[in-house]
């Protein structure tokens, strides 16, 4: 995303044989500033990924104990591990989308076909969607913490972060 913006602006100026204008420089400075916010958010989510996944799974299983009861979709250590792995993969691809500012990496490499896979395995997509929403709540809370991050209004970025989780929940639910 950032490289494309810089390349486009420089190419346009070069094709006209001009220096970059003050407006163009200001716009590029804003891209860098916004990029720092994205990096802060991704770093926070990544640093807390294990807790986000574990706590979301714990809350899901408290709400839906049938999942971990004998015969449940997360019963046995192997199935539980698969559940946690899938939640971690979804979270990882959400961070890629946040960094890129684009959901296509999330869609193309993670979500496309995931619902069908879960249906074929008999995994309740609605339960996975609840788990994703719980990860969203935790990740947004962590990303919204104003301590130690780039200052400025992050409401649009936080809304974007939430939208990637909503997209993932809708894809599996």
UniProtKB/Swiss-Prot annotation:
Annotated positions binding (2R,3E)-phycocyanobilin 1: 83
InterPro entries: Globin-like_sf (IPR009050), Phycobilisome_asu/bsu (IPR012128), Phycobilisome_asu/bsu_sf (IPR038719), Phycocyanin_b (IPR006247)
SUPFAM superfamilies: Globin-like
GO cellular component: phycobilisome; plasma membrane-derived thylakoid membrane
Signal peptide (UniProt feature, chain positions): none
Positions that bind (2R,3E)-phycocyanobilin 2: 154
Post-translational modification: Contains two covalently linked bilin chromophores.
Record's keyword annotation contains Glycosyltransferase: no
Keyword terms: Antenna complex, Bile pigment, Chromophore, Electron transport, Membrane, Methylation, Photosynthesis, Phycobilisome, Thylakoid, Transport
Domain of life: Bacteria
Protein name: C-phycocyanin beta subunit
């Amino acid at each position: 995303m950032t490289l494309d913006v810089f390349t486009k602006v420089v190419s346009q100026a070069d094709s006209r044989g001009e220096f970059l204008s003050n407006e163009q420089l200001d716009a590029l400075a804003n891209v860098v500033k916004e990029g720092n916010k994205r990096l802060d958010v991704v770093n926070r989510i990544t640093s807390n990924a294990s807790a986000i996944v574990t706590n979301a799974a714990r809350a899901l299983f408290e709400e839906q104990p049938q999942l971990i009861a004998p015969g449940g979709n997360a019963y046995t250590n192997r199935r539980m591990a698969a559940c946690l792995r899938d939640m971690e993969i979804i979270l990882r691809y959400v961070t890629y989308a946040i960094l890129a500012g684009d959901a296509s990496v999330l869609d193309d490499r993670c979500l496309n076909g995931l619902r069908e896979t879960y249906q074929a395995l008999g995994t309740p997509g609605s339960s996975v969607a609840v788990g994703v929403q719980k990860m969203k709540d935790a990740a947004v809370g962590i990303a919204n913490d104003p301590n130690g991050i780039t200052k400025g209004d992050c409401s649009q970025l936080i809304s974007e972060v939430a939208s990637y989780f909503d997209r993932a929940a809708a894809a599996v639910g």
